[in-house]
A protein has these predicted regions:
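Residue position within the beta-strands of beta-propeller blades
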Residues: 35-37, 80-83, 136-137, 195, ...
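Blade-level signature of beta-propeller repeat domains, shared across WD40, Kelch, NHL, RCC1
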Residues: 284-327
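Loop/turn-rich, solvent-exposed surfaces of beta-rich toroidal or solenoidal domains
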Residues: 194, 200, 221-267
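Short glycine/acidic-enriched loop and turn motifs that connect beta-strands
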Residues: 41-43, 85-89, 141-143, 200-202, ...
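Asp-box/WD-like beta-propeller blade repeats and closely related beta-sheet repeat scaffolds
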Residues: 8-10, 88-133, 137, 141-143, ...
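Beta-rich, blade/repeat-based domains predominating
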Residues: 17-31, 63-88, 115-133, 165-192, ...
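A short beta-strand motif characteristic of beta-propeller blades
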Residues: 9-17, 53-62, 109-116, 158-175, ...
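Short loop/turn segments immediately following beta-strands, especially the blade-tip
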Residues: 47-52, 97-105, 147-155, 205-214, ...
Length: 327
């Protein structure tokens, strides 16, 4: 996958938040509106579809008792949000949010469907691998949880799905708040789960048995050399776009480990440094016609965790990134 074939990226800021807002995770809705979790303020926000004009104004939805982390849509307008007390009690929950009859301005009522037990430490990214199965990264327990959802939308159950050395964080290292396993995404065409491990600077994958939905083998190294946070994957092109958070870039890597062996780090955005991409945390493809693989939306924390060169954090943002072929 030579770097000269990588696309160019056009960045447009579509929404802004105050400084010191750690935009953590997102879910694109069918109309291209966005749900955004804010880790340090424990909040959930709504971003209107950026169609008629940009920027748009974010709409506050609710506050949780713990940090708001991963969010995933399991069926149209039904979302599951995980929350965790990351630093003290490690109390962690899964909430169900039904937006089928919701419209902006109405209140919402997330329902707790699961309280996690030991060895939970800090829930992070999440993804759907079957119609009723969610995988959730636990970035401080060095593992991935499997959550089975009941068909009737009631209480859920959880158990450890996979624990591996590649998922570990370093509580005694120079950045003890740096997560281990962080973002998780499922490639439906190949039945691989891909995940980032931020502390170890790894991008990994593990095959999933399509019948049992359990790991089918050991995790496999895909790429390394960057502090990847989360990512979105383009299965048609066979690539992933990784957000590097503290390193302020979006990097493109192949989903095939063999194609990364002689491939140096390639940043499609953020090199050279740009004020529009300070602290990118996650990304997701737009859901409009023809947007998959071409138009994605990314969150930034504005330097909340790692300030830009002058030491002053900027407003957190939602950025639209349009990928176009290099000439």
């Amino acid at each position: 996958m030579p770097s000269e074939n990588a696309p160019r990226a056009k960045l447009t800021t579509i929404a802004s938040f105050p400084r010191q807002y750690f935009l953590e995770n997102m879910a694109m809705r069918g109309d291209n509106s966005i749900l955004v979790t804010v880790a340090n303020h424990r909040e959930l926000w709504y971003i209107p579809p950026p169609i008629a004009k940009v920027p748009v104004d974010p709409l506050f939805l609710c506050t949780f008792a713990q940090s708001a982390m991963g969010i995933v849509e399991v069926e149209p307008n039904i979302f599951y949000i995980c929350t965790s007390n990351l630093w003290t009690s490690h109390e962690s929950y899964l909430h169900r949010l039904d937006l089928r009859d919701w419209s902006p301005g109405k209140s919402i009522n997330p329902e707790v469907v699961l309280k996690f037990t030991e060895p939970v430490r800090g829930l992070n990214g999440s993804c759907l691998i079957a119609s009723n199965i969610i995988l959730i990264a636990d970035c401080f327990a060095n593992l991935i949880w499997r959550v089975d959802l009941p068909r009737d939308g009631g209480k859920a159950t959880a158990r450890v799905w996979l624990k591996h050395d590649s998922m570990a964080y370093d509580p005694d290292g120079p950045m003890p708040d740096q997560p281990g396993v962080n973002g998780v995404k499922f490639a439906t065409k190949t039945n691989y789960l891909y995940y980032t491990s931020t502390t170890k600077q790894l991008f990994m994958r593990v095959r999933i048995d399509p019948n049992s939905h359990e790991p089918a083998g050991e995790p496999e190294f895909v790429a390394g050399g960057r502090m990847a946070d989360d990512f979105c994957i383009d299965e048609n092109a066979g690539v992933a776009y990784l957000t590097t958070h503290r390193q302020n870039t979006i990097d493109r890597v192949s989903l095939d480990p063999s194609e990364n062996r002689d491939f140096g780090r390639h940043s499609v955005a953020g090199k050279p440094f740009t004020e529009q991409l300070i602290g990118p945390t996650t990304g997701a493809w737009g859901r409009g016609p023809g947007e998959y693989g071409r138009v994605a939306y990314f969150l930034t924390d504005g330097g909340t965790k790692s300030p830009p060169p002058n030491g002053i954090a900027r407003p957190a943002t939602v950025v639209r990134v349009e990928f176009t072929a290099s000439p």
